[in-house]
Curated annotation (Swiss-Prot):
NCBIfam families: pyrC_dimer (TIGR00856). The lineage of its organism: Bacteria, Pseudomonadati, Pseudomonadota, Gammaproteobacteria, Moraxellales. This is Dihydroorotase. Its cofactor is Zn(2+). Pathway: Pyrimidine metabolism; UMP biosynthesis via de novo pathway; (S)-dihydroorotate from bicarbonate: step 3/3. GO terms for biological process: 'de novo' pyrimidine nucleobase biosynthetic process; 'de novo' UMP biosynthetic process. GO terms for molecular function: dihydroorotase activity; zinc ion binding. CDD domains: DHOase (cd01294).
Amino acid sequence: MNSITLLQPDDWHAHLRDGLALKRTVPDLAKQFARAICMPNLVPPVKTVEEALAYRERILAHVPEGNNFDPRMVLYFTDHTSPDEVRKIKESEHVNAIKLYPAGATTNSDNGVSDIRKVYAVIEQLEEHQVPLLLHGEVTHNHVDIFDREKRFLDEVLSPLLKQFPKLKVVLEHITTSDAAHFVLEQDRNVAATITPQHLLFNRNDMLVGGIKPHFYCLPILKRQTHQTTLLEVATSGNPKFFLGTDSAPHAQNAKENACGCAGCYSAPNAIELYAQAFDQVGKLERLEGFASHFGADFYGLPRNTSTITLVKEDNLVPESFDYLDNQKIIPLHAGKTLQWRKV
């Protein structure tokens, strides 16, 4: 197969940041996707529908002319989120979900939920109104090994949560383990998962063997190859529980390449080509459209896109860097390497 045409894909998990960063991040994402779930972990975080709509306007100001990119907004779940905010989400045209970060789990997550039992009143409303709860699925206790944090979250947090709220709509974001894949498969249709390009294409050897490569460092961290293999199997299976979410996370080069570098891979500029490469490597390119363009929209209850994109099989050199912020650079995922697919 030398070319493939798909309904325009959506990104159900992306970080755009705010302020000057939007000049870089919004056009990069808008060239690839029709819609994106825009993460709320700003400083300060996006905690109300009003704040989300104001952030959406700041994003729209950077969408290139002639592009119909539609930012879909999310609220940041805190210990102090009001149950009434769920009703406002349900009534909003542009806000689609609420995101739970365990406090301290990832970038700008200090305001996250400290104990999920504290917010059961809000979760009751989420279940009643069928508003999706998006989960960063890791525990954050210092004594838990970083490679075990996703599995422990499933056992200690998510399993009890779904017993208490069996109809809750849940997206387990950026899954990285066989444990998470099998957990999602075992649940009813109300539980789904997103998968990033880096967790399909790479594993922890790519990050750690032959020198530490900070641009592969993200959270949840890359796992061993056996987990990567399982993620590829479920992503390419045609199962509608699994769909595209890049978790594209911009950090300036100097914030990644230092003694305590930030977590996040910037995949937005070549995201759909990265996914195409992963699907093609296992001979499942015909399954890409469902994963990228159908299943996420279906889960969120939104119409599928009607426009299309075409990918052709030809060498596509990923740039070494892009301009970012004031006189800084950002290094994209797979910088300087050649992909086999190009969006035309």
